[in-house]
Amino acid sequence: MFNAEFFPTPAWLTEEMLSLVNLRSVHSILEPSAGKGDIIEVIRSKMHRPRIYCCEIDPELQMILNGKGVTILNDDFLSFTAQGYYFDLVVMNPPFSQGVQHLLHAWNIISEGEILCLLNAETIRNPYSEERQLLTKLIADSGQVQFYPRAFADAERQTPVDVALVHLRKVQVACHFDFMEGLKQQAQ
């Protein structure tokens, strides 16, 4: 069944993820590792005509997504630049072996918005690498994490792994210009 890291997100867990955001304020959504569209289907059930885009590297899964009318922007999310696109919500369950890279890449390509990401819980609990330490700091500065033991134990594709739901919020920093200070500097 597809690749070794294909673990479709259970609907109940997607519901938990989406409960952390106000979907009424969301305009454009990216699902970077869409699989066969399980997360997308739950989003579609909660929103009227959402603008959802995705990336998916597996050609067979791409065919399934095409059949569901999902817009695929790129195959490999880690090479996706998002140039010309704006996403205010990224929802993902990336391959566990690349979870940190996917989450950090998502953070880098959005200018403002929220990210909901499922990771292997060990990614958070054991920050042995520089990337994991960076992620730990990012969560401390801009987000939160919730742990779900054995969340995929009864899923379509089962695994006893504990997962971490990371919720990050990126706020665009406004440029502040003091007009009076600018005039004072010009006068000098």
What are these model-predicted stretches?
Residues 1-188:
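Class I S-adenosyl-L-methionine-dependent methyltransferase catalytic core
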